[in-house]
Amino acid sequence: MKHIVFITNPISGTISKAGIPELVEVHLDHARFSYEFVSTQYAGHATLLAQEAAASGADIVCAIGGDGTVNEVGRGLLGTETAMAILPCGSGNGLARHLMLPMDLKRCLDIINLDTVETLDSGVINGHPFFCTCGMGFDAFISMKFAEAGKRGLMTYVEQMLREGLSYKPETYEIEDEMGSKTYKAFLISAANASQYGNNAYIAPHASMSDGLLDVIIMQPFSLIEAPQVTLEMLNKTIDKNVNIRTFKARHVHIHRSKPGLIHYDGDPLMSDADVEIEVKPKSICVVVNPHADEAARQPNMMQTAASELFYNMDRIRTQITRQGRNIQATNLKLLRKLNLK
């Protein structure tokens, strides 16, 4: 019989956890699993609890909470044979959604009962492990504002994005990987081990947790009129088609910026040095996965692709009109000068 330790963060996420012990008692397969519950008492406690569970021989440690709790539990299980399971109770649930776990907790317990475990990749940014995404720029800035807001949920995140997006200033970054070095002015830079931030906002639709690579996304500055397009393309899984997006895969990247600033790992913000090291750790964590997950569901469908193409063509037409307008203005200016009218 296998043993599961359920780690619950009583204050994380947007879902009450009061009924979860009863749900586990009713729906967990008791012929296959014994279990116990432990609760976190402070930030970082889930990592210690997960380490203790793994050291005592637990077969599975289940994180009950949001991406922050999942990150803490995952950190405690890196390099062990103890698998991490997830009962998603957060505001974004990025890793659970990437793994195509249902948001219904009973159905998640059904998946735990199937006991399908895979060894997947993780990442590290300046010494901090992550499992979904890490980055700097606007998303790290919003992660800080979100943490300061005092309330969770998608609407809080959107509110912070709308409030801060108009005034945020892009930075210049020098990015070096195995292929060389380039300099970009960017709104944000994200390194993705998994495909989304959470709430089905796909920053890296093609990211895989089993390819030994990170998807690096460089979002270059864009205009206010383009902001709705960027949002829609993230939800449509077509952000990689946007003309302001540059993507590549890498095992390791070194990023230099002009001064220290914010970074984030799985949505947790912190101040860091001007130099940032990001690397993948292949096959570093065992995870209970959904054996019925359809990988194709992470890719855009025909309607989503068509919407992306429409936006792309509109953007191209707008660019051409702008360029033609500038050419006409330049021609008119030359003509006026020849006529000594200007």
Residue ranges and their predicted role:
Residues 1-60, 294, 304-315, 326, ...:
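ATP/NTP phosphate-donor binding region
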Residues 10, 64-66, 89:
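Glycine-rich beta-strand-to-loop/alpha-helix junction loops that act as flexible
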Residues 17, 218-342:
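ATP/nucleoside-binding phosphotransfer catalytic cores, i.e., glycine-rich phosphate-binding loops
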Residues 31, 79-83, 87-191:
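Catalytic core of DAGKc-family lipid kinases
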Residues 46, 68-73:
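Short glycine/serine/threonine-rich phosphate/pyrophosphate-binding segments
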Residues 128-134, 183-192, 197-198, 215-218, ...:
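Short hydrophobic-aromatic micro-motifs
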Residues 177-178, 185-250:
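Internal anion-binding site segments
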